[in-house]
Amino acid sequence: MVSIRPDEISSIIRQQIEQYDQEIQVSNVGTVLQVGDGIARVYGLDKVMSGELLEFEDGTIGIALNLEADNVGVVLMGDGRNILEGSSVRATQKIAQVPVGDAVIGRVVDALARPIDGKGDIATTDTRLIESSAPGIISRKFVYEPLQTGITAIDAMIPIPRGQRELIIGDRQTGKTAVAIDTILNQKGQGVVCVYVAIGQKASSVAQVVGVLQEKGALDYTVIVAANADDPATLQYLAPYTGASIAEYFMYKGQHTLVIYDDLSKQAQAYRQMSLLLRRPPGREAYPGDVFYLHSRLLERAAKLSPQLGEGSMTALPIVETQAGDVCAYIPTNVISITDGQIFLSADLFNSGLRPAINVGISVSRVGSAAQIKAMKQVAGKLKLELAQFDELKAFSQFSSDLDKATQLQLARGERLRELLKQQQYAPLPVEEQVAVIYTGINGFLDNIETKQVSAFISNLRENLSVKRAKFGEIIRSEKALTAEAENLLKDAISDCKQAFLSNI
């Protein structure tokens, strides 16, 4: 018979008492009162933060936006078809975060940075909050480095420095996206990480952009964030913030980044839809009262950081679509007041054959020539003046039939300057070629060449400089100035080209 020892039993009980770990899990749970149109009303979530992620029974995630006395207004990040009235909702005590890091480069992701390109998961452990504070005044440095777009009209007259926010504004089908894509293509080999955010666009349009970037080898340094037209309004609202978070990761590592938001008009419309469904009071054009803050907190995240923070930068190129050229509408005026300047694309110029259709008269960069190399400053000042005088004379000449010789010559030169600013799509020019092209125009070397022949002459000149006089490009790239030696090389190239060109006509 087995003997029972009381001391042994008591020691076993003592061990089990010591190992006992009482853990009470308290979860904040609510009940769905109403659901529909991408919005859910939830009762019982007493301890929930604004912007907190909530999980529904079917696995759908939502964001708490409206905190009211008796319910919480939640926007859904999915279709929410399986959410029923009376089903439970759990607070996660988390704010929306997205994966970031080098592994994201070259990928196409959705508004929550989940891959949608069929290339598998993104192998990264780093995350950033979708909404984070913009750098303060002490954290910033004055912008001074040029971000070359490869578009002559912009780099010469509306220069963009690294860390600036420059608005691209114009009617639909005026080439806004083309300007942005050219800018991405021109960053090849410059060490700039590009983020292209497509908001509310057709999937076919996004696929076309991906195809162009892949073909030109630009996808190797670009991330594409896509919230397509068929995605919920919540994802279209979040996509720009996700793009900014991805770019911020590289900025705080001391790298240079470029973010393109295409376009913020659609984000504002998605936010208006959400706000009206949440029964927030409508304001001008039915937008909610905080629509200015929607864009200001996004665009303020673009900055040139101080040396203490690594001197990284985030340059933002937001795009806004206008209706019939009306820049005085609510969203355009808001974004114009937030940004550091705007590039205005005109439908009239586009239809007249001037592409890119940049209206230099009302386009502006508030930083100006601080973002230009010395060589560009040497030639760009005269170009602005010549074009301004040309526009004035052209308007005047419509009312006068007999013009003096000097006026006729100035009008002829203006026509040729306009012609040399034309560029093919997806063919950005390096800065040394831009300097050569502008120098040729402003110094009258094109005056005896027919306007329709200017494009062919410029093409021959660029080829001559790159093949026979490569030293010209080397001097501009290294010295950043149009030295006497570079100017002589350029004059020789122009002379050779003119001789060959005029003999063939």
UniProtKB/Swiss-Prot annotation:
Gene Ontology, cellular component aspect: cyanelle thylakoid membrane; proton-transporting ATP synthase complex
Known role: Produces ATP from ADP in the presence of a proton gradient across the membrane. The alpha chain is a regulatory subunit.
Reaction equation(s) it catalyzes: ATP + H2O + 4 H(+)(in) = ADP + phosphate + 5 H(+)(out)
PANTHER family for this protein: ATP SYNTHASE SUBUNIT ALPHA, MITOCHONDRIAL
Group of enzyme by EC: translocase
Classification via Gene3D superfamilies: 2.40.30.20, ATP synthase alpha/beta chain, C-terminal domain (1.20.150.20), P-loop containing nucleotide triphosphate hydrolases (3.40.50.300)
Subcellular location: Plastid, Cyanelle thylakoid membrane
Keyword match Ligase: no
Subunit description: F-type ATPases have 2 components, CF(1) - the catalytic core - and CF(0) - the membrane proton channel. CF(1) has five subunits: alpha(3), beta(3), gamma(1), delta(1), epsilon(1). CF(0) has four main subunits: a, b, b' and c.
EC nos: 7.1.2.2
Assigned keywords, A-Z: ATP synthesis, ATP-binding, CF(1), Cyanelle, Hydrogen ion transport, Ion transport, Membrane, Nucleotide-binding, Plastid, Thylakoid, Translocase, Transport
InterPro entries per UniProt: ATP_synth_asu-like_sf, ATP_synth_asu_C, ATP_synth_asu_C_sf, ATP_synth_F1_a_nt-bd_dom, ATP_synth_F1_asu, ATPase_a/bsu_AS, ATPase_F1/V1/A1_a/bsu_N, ATPase_F1/V1/A1_a/bsu_N_sf
PROSITE patterns membership: ATPASE_ALPHA_BETA
Gene responsible for this protein: atpA
Membrane topology (UniProt): Peripheral membrane protein
Family note: Belongs to the ATPase alpha/beta chains family.
Record protein name field: ATP synthase subunit alpha, cyanelle
